[in-house]
């Protein structure tokens, strides 16, 4: 009578309940998580995909998934299920770690660019006080060039001209200090 379910009152203790393993719902949730992980891997660029540790069978499945038309075809959904099924028998921790590194790199780059934009705005609005602070942090910058760009950007704003110096200042800062931020 091991395959027949008993009413709850007939169980001796909680250990008998644990013998059945994870519920069907939990198995479906786990499969869905792996399927979403597979979809993330398929959506990566080729250079990012090379950084993910995949065995040959899984790499072939991902490559085929990249060739299918996403979200327009039932075959793509079934293929994602197949990729999820392949990942069930593999250790997915290294794959998840590599994916998180790729995602964090994007957010780190965005944060750097945002800090550059903040410096540019401060230089234009605060003038010399922001310039002195920037120069104290980054000695290799050309103070004279920055002052000239600040004056030109302010003049462009006053005359409602296209922001040529504004953009040029950003490009200069990006070229000189982006890696240092």
UniProtKB/Swiss-Prot annotation:
UniProt GO BP: assembly of large subunit precursor of preribosome
Keyword Transit peptide: no
Keyword match Nuclease: no
Cell compartment(s), UniProt: Cytoplasm
SUPFAM superfamilies per record: PSPTO4464-like
GO terms, molecular function: ribosome binding; rRNA binding
Coiled-coil segments on the chain, per record: none
Highest taxon listed in the record's lineage: Bacteria
Any one cellular-component term (Gene Ontology): cytosol
Main localisation: cytoplasm
Function of the protein: Member of a network of 50S ribosomal subunit biogenesis factors which assembles along the 30S-50S interface, preventing incorrect 23S rRNA structures from forming. Promotes peptidyl transferase center (PTC) maturation.
Classification via PANTHER family: UPF0307 PROTEIN YJGA (PTHR38101:SF1)
Family, as annotated: Belongs to the DarP family.
Name of the molecule in the record: Dual-action ribosomal maturation protein DarP
């Amino acid at each position: 009578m091991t395959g027949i379910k008993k009413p709850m009152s007939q169980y001796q203790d909680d250990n008998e309940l644990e013998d059945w393993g994870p519920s069907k719902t939990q198995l479906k949730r786990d499969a869905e998580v792996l399927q979403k992980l597979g979809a993330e891997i398929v959506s990566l660029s080729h250079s990012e995909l090379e950084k993910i540790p995949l065995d040959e069978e899984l790499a072939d499945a991902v490559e085929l998934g990249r060739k299918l038309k996403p979200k327009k075809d039932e075959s793509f959904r079934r293929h994602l299920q197949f990729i999820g099924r392949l990942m069930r028998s593999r250790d997915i921790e290294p794959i998840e770690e590599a994916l998180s590194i790729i995602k964090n790199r994007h957010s780190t780059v965005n944060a750097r660019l945002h800090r550059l934009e903040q410096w540019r705005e401060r230089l234009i609005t605060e003038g010399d006080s922001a310039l002195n602070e920037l120069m104290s942090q980054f000695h290799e910058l050309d103070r004279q060039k920055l002052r000239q760009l600040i004056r030109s950007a302010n003049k462009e704003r006053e005359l409602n001209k296209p922001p040529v110096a504004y953009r040029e200042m950003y490009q200069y800062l990006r070229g000189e200090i982006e890696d240092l931020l």
